[in-house]
Amino acid sequence: MPLHHQQFSEQEQFVLNVLNNKKNGYYVELGAAHSINGSNTYRLENEFDWSGVSFEIVPELHKEVSKNRKNPCVLGDATKFDYIKYFQENNFPDQIDYLQVDIDSGYKLNGRPQGNAYLSLHGLISVPLNKYRFSVITFEHDANMYWRNTAMRDAQREILDSLGYSLVVREIHEDWWVDPNVIDLETYRPFFKWNTL
């Protein structure tokens, strides 16, 4: 089944496809950036009634997301958040449907330019992956833009592979994963795409 190209993201369409257009799901979005067009969670929230939480560190982008979306958007550093407390207080299930990791705007770490600070990796390991599972994970590593990010790409692959996730889409700038305990091979097999190392 091909992904639909439109104003909404391919990641979001992938989530809907492999979860059979699930209603009332849950998402966690590290790096919200856009509230509607280009968002990886807008349709999930507005057309499929998903609950979730987004994180954005850039005040202007946070303001836009908060204005245009019903689910909360936290203004702050997604790498320093108490996820367990938040998930428990907001009744998130142990098996959360979607984790989106794309932290690359507004951060500077150790004086490095944006994108070279392994921030998406920091975000990924900040989430309690040993306590919560995610049915789908999309991870933007931007290895095509910053040569240092190939190490970040490889590290997230080792982490998620060791936790039993299956890599379905491997692109020059992002990876898409599924939990094979929740999504069977026949469902995600049509989406296999490995276009890069």
Label each region the model flagged.
Residues 1, 15, 110-114:
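Polar low-complexity intrinsically disordered regions
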Residues 16-17, 87-91, 124-129:
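Short amphipathic alpha-helices and their capping/turn segments at secondary-structure boundaries
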Residues 20-23, 89-96, 131:
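Glycine-rich phosphate-binding loop signature in dinucleotide/nucleotide-binding domains
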Residues 58, 71-74, 79-99, 103-113:
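Glycine-rich adenosyl-binding loop in Rossmann-like folds that engage adenosine-containing cofactors
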Residues 65-67, 86, 179-183:
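Short secondary-structure transition/capping segments
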